[in-house]
Regions:
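Conserved RecA-like helicase ATPase core segment
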Residues: 2-3, 7-10, 15, 48, ...
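P-loop NTPase Walker
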Residues: 1-127, 133, 228, 252-256, ...
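Conserved beta-strand -> loop -> alpha-helix junction used to position metal-binding or nucleic-acid-contacting
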Residues: 95-116, 134-135, 439-465
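ATPase/helicase motor core of nucleic-acid motors
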Residues: 152, 317, 378-381, 407-526
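Inter-lobe coupling/hinge region of RecA-like P-loop helicase motors
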Residues: 11-19, 23-27, 31-39, 64, ...
């Protein structure tokens, strides 16, 4: 007996009917499949239904043989909960399958999956199975030791803490892009030779040349950092991916065992996978029952190695033969928004679908985000636009909008909630203060929130200074809190530079804390 997507939907939730797009995704053959899903298009529910369809129609697939990968622990937990709930419903309605469905699917972050491969199979490439994970704080401490002992200045324009942060960031970028220190050196030196041909004709060219030279200088500490980690039996997050990729590439038996263990694989937020993650997954699960879900319009991790071509090259990387019809599908029904809101969103996103000038004449991209269409029965909705000239008027318009929405009648006795989005994080406290002043309770979601409160900022300033005495902006915050005026702070800055010159240092390396510890005599003037 073969169950269709519509029949399975009726079993788990008879109030919903899958769209034709969802049916095509759910019932797709067991082969590499790319699903380009717009925002709010029900991708998680559709992926859950695909898992149920595979379980109901393929006896060799069990819940434990389903692998779901995503980027955060929270997302992995939510995906696991959704799958377990749906599997329980299917098992209850189809008793003949209950014994085979008495297991849980495996949902992990991409990094956790790599860590599992290394911990279980690392010995096959000479990795000690008792390795320890290096935390972010541990990485900072280790790199700080290396930088402080480095025989030459690595960057005159940055504080020691700034240098450490930049070097660790570059180390992560090298790993995420699949480079070694040596191959990165060759690439950067080659780029440097190209820059020499261009010359220092303008400020942008000079800045680019300087940045490239800085990266080359940072490679030395990175090389020592990696050596120290090996000697101490430590791995960081980037190491997990590099070593896991090496294992599946060099040990065919591991690759075969993992493919046998996981008969079906779901790759969530695939547009944000990095070069090294793509290499790991395509090496391991090429020509396998892999469903990758993503949306190029929601790519957010390009700064840390995410490949812009992840969606475009999915079938090329995961399939040896030519792609067939039906291997790239879309989900375009937006279940969250009314018609006018979708019209505005599609208009804003329209430039993202245009072919860039450097791609002119090439084949149209086949992994573009779909134009969203409203759900059946969607209302017209309302889009209001305010464009005040003054910032204070913009805040007032925001408060007025939130107040009007919260005043609308509701049926469940609860006030309507409102989300306020801002392009700039520094606007959060101002928006928050304006809403609170109007008597509207608020919560700042994500980073910030409590950390932005003045008292907490003062505590953080003291801690930052305890870690890095050169963190002058944090000291300036504390000094401003004891009623020192702008003229006083300027005078302290001048005195700090005077002390630096007296010690034979570059004035740009002046430390404001030195000026506070050894203040100038009354009447001093530079």
């Amino acid at each position: 007996m073969t169950l269709s997507a519509t029949q399975i939907q009726a079993i788990v939730d008879a109030t919903k009917t899958p769209t034709p797009e969802q049916v095509r995704v759910v019932e797709a053959p067991r082969r590499p499949l790319l699903v380009v899903a717009g925002a709010g298009s029900g991708k998680t529910e559709t992926m859950s239904m695909r898992v149920l369809w595979l379980l109901a129609n393929h006896p060799d697939v069990t819940p434990a043989s389903i692998l779901g990968l995503t980027f955060t622990r929270k997302a992995a937990g939510e995906l696991g909960d959704r799958l377990r709930e749906r599997i329980r419903l299917l098992s209850r309605e189809l008793p003949q399958l209950s014994e085979r469905l008495d297991e849980d699917p495996v949902t992990l972050t991409y990094n956790s999956f790599a860590e599992r491969i290394v911990s279980e199979h690392g010995m096959r490439i000479g990795i000690d199975p008792d390795f320890s994970m290096l935390s972010e704080a541990g990485a900072l401490d280790l790199m700080t030791q290396i930088v402080e002992a480095w025989p030459t200045d690595l960057d005159d324009d940055l504080s020691p803490a700034g240098v450490v942060g930049r070097i660790l960031h570059l180390a992560g970028e090298i790993a995420e892009h699949g480079y070694t220190v040596e191959s990165a050196r060759q690439a950067l030196e080659g780029f440097g030779r190209e820059l020499e041909i261009v010359g220092d004709s303008n400020e942008a060219a000079r800045d680019l040349h300087q940045a490239n030279q800085r990266r080359i200088a940072f490679l030395g500490p990175i090389e020592v950092y990696q050596k120290r980690k090996r000697e101490m039996g430590l791995l960081d997050f980037s190491d997990q991916l590099v070593l896991a990729t090496r294992i599946v590439r060099e040990v065919p038996s591991v690759r075969a065992a993992l493919r046998e263990e996981f008969r079906a694989v779901l790759l969530d937020e695939f547009q944000d996978t990095s070069v090294i993650q793509m290499e790991l997954l395509s090496t391991l699960f090429g020509d396998h029952a892999v469903t990758a879900v993503g949306d190029p319009n929601q790519a957010i991790y390009g700064w840390r190695g995410a490949s812009a071509s992840s969606l475009e090259t999915f079938l090329e990387r995961f399939q040896t033969g030519a792609p067939e019809e039906g291997q790239t599908l879309t989900l375009s029904t937006a279940w969250r928004n009314d018609v006018s809101i979708l019209e505005a969103a599609n208009r804003v996103a329209e430039p993202l679908r245009e072919v860039a000038s450097y791609q002119a004449g090439k084949e149209q991209l086949n992994a573009q985000s779909p134009v969203l269409v409203p759900r059946p029965g969607a209302g017209r909705g309302v889009v209001e636009i305010a464009y005040p000239a003054a910032y204070e008027d913009a805040l007032a318009a925001t408060v007025d909008f939130v107040r009007r929405v919260r005043a609308q009648p509701v049926t469940d006795g609860k006030r309507r909630t409102v989300a306020v989005l801002s392009r700039r994080r520094k606007d959060f406290p101002l928006i928050d203060a304006a809403l609170r002043e109007a008597g509207i309770p608020t919560e700042i979601v994500g980073l910030g929130g409590l950390l932005d409160q003045p008292a907490v900022q003062d505590v953080r300033a003291a801690l930052e200074l305890g870690y890095d005495v050169a963190a002058s902006p944090w000291l300036a915050r504390l000094l401003a809190g004891i009623d020192l005026g702008a003229a006083d702070l300027i005078a302290l800055g001048d005195w700090a530079r005077f002390l630096a010159r007296a010690e034979g240092l570059n004035p740009h390396q002046a430390v404001l804390l030195d000026a506070v510890d050894r203040p100038p005599t009354p009447g001093w003037a530079d």
